[in-house]
């Protein structure tokens, strides 16, 4: 198990490479990373104002001209007006190309602050400090940034790798339980596409997997981050292999949009994982036991595994505009076995209907 008293570093081997440091009390690391910057802007969500101010003061103590930029929580903060606000503040305080941003918050804060960093002066440095499980294992690692528009989720964005990612496990101590549960969907995804030990650890004790004070969760986080780091290193710009990280996301993103983002990302992805497993099972590509294992593990963590039985026509319409769709043809990441991800391109409409009915069955 990962020793939460000793920081662990996972390297993301892109060019240039950067570290993902997992531990507790990592603000000293942040000071060291940014001590040579003239100005720094800390982009944070409302509930983290106190931590953001501590960061500002610590950087100021190192001679850095640091500022705070507060943005709305969750998906409400991932739109063009919020990015425009960040740009306006960056211009007002004079952030230059050799300065830096810090993102502090969940996955949405990482996405929008990362996009602002990618586009301001055509790219300035950013350090991510994710404070949610979802942000730690998914949004903060890999360099994907983006915002939502009326056309869809994350359709506007850029690849912009951070200077570093600091995963401070202490922030999980105060994370609401429903946030912890939803973040586990991305951990489970990593288990199915690449690291079955993740699934074994969860099955052994689902409640221990959700305990921020225990030693199981840090190990799950390390393993999930390692999966993503290895995939990103092999395919930074999502030309092919990185697409496997979208397992469960085609339907998941459609559910989020249909629900106007009232459903949490992890909850929607959980249903998407079950749907993708059912697609593969019906197509003869995945055995019954592994497909059922999706439901069992996700349910044991308190994640949803079914959705509105009447929603498929609307979901299909939304999925047709998904960024993973090419030339109007739906694409799904599916499994050809445990830790054997593949793709299903243009599935038969009848197969989609039958698979969705299976998801909606009690």
UniProtKB/Swiss-Prot annotation:
The reaction(s) this protein catalyses: 7-phospho-2-dehydro-3-deoxy-D-arabino-heptonate = 3-dehydroquinate + phosphate
Molecular function in Gene Ontology: 3-dehydroquinate synthase activity; copper ion binding; nucleotide binding; zinc ion binding
Pathway annotation: Metabolic intermediate biosynthesis; chorismate biosynthesis; chorismate from D-erythrose 4-phosphate and phosphoenolpyruvate: step 2/7
EC number from the UniProt entry: 4.2.3.4
GO CC list: cytosol; peptidoglycan-based cell wall; plasma membrane
SUPFAM superfamilies xrefs: Dehydroquinate synthase-like (SSF56796)
KW NAD (keyword) present: yes
Cofactor or coenzyme needed: NAD(+); Co(2+); Zn(2+)
Binding site for Zn(2+): 186, 249, 265
Function noted in UniProt: Catalyzes the conversion of 3-deoxy-D-arabino-heptulosonate 7-phosphate (DAHP) to dehydroquinate (DHQ).
Other notes: Was identified as a high-confidence drug target.
Listed name of the protein: 3-dehydroquinate synthase
Source organism of the structure: Mycobacterium tuberculosis (strain ATCC 25618 / H37Rv)
Gene of this entry: aroB
């Amino acid at each position: 198990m990962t020793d939460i008293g000793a920081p662990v570093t996972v390297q993301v081997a892109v060019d240039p490479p950067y570290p993902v440091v997992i531990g507790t009390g990592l603000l000293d690391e942040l000071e060291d990373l940014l001590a040579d910057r003239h100005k720094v802007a800390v982009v944070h969500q409302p509930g983290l104002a106190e931590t953001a101010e501590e960061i500002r003061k610590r950087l100021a103590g190192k001679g850095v001209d640091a500022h705070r930029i507060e943005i709305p929580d969750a998906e409400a903060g991932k739109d063009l007006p919020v990015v425009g606000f960040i740009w306006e503040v960056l211009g007002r305080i004079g952030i230059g190309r050799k300065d830096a941003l810090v993102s502090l918050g969940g996955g949405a804060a990482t996405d929008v602050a990362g996009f602002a960093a990618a586009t301001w002066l055509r790219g300035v440095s950013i350090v991510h400090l994710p404070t949610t499980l979802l942000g730690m294992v998914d949004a903060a690692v890999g360099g994907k940034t983006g915002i939502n528009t009326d056309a869809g989720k994350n359709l506007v964005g850029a690849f912009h790798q951070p200077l570093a990612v600091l995963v401070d496990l202490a922030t999980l101590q105060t994370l609401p339980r429903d946030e912890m549960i939803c973040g586990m969907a991305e951990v489970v995804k990593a288990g199915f596409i690449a690291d079955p030990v993740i699934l074994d650890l969860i099955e052994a004790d689902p409640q221990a997997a959700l305990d921020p004070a225990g030693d199981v969760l840090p190990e799950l986080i390390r393993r999930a981050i390692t999966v993503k780091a290895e995939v990103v290193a092999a395919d930074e710009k999502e030309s092919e292999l990185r697409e496997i990280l979208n397992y469960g996301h085609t339907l998941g993103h459609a559910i989020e949009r249909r629900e106007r983002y009232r459903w949490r990302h992890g909850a929607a992805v959980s249903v998407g994982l079950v749907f993708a497993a059912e697609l593969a099972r019906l197509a003869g590509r995945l055995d019954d036991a592994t497909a059922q294992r999706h439901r069992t593990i996700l349910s044991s963590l308190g994640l949803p595994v079914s959705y509105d039985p009447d929603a498929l026509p609307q979901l299909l319409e939304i999925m047709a505009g998904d960024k993973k769709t090419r030339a109007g043809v739906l694409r799904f990441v599916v499994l050809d076995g445990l830790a054997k991800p593949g793709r299903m391109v243009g599935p038969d409409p009848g197969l989609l209907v039958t698979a969705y009915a299976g998801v909606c069955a009690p």
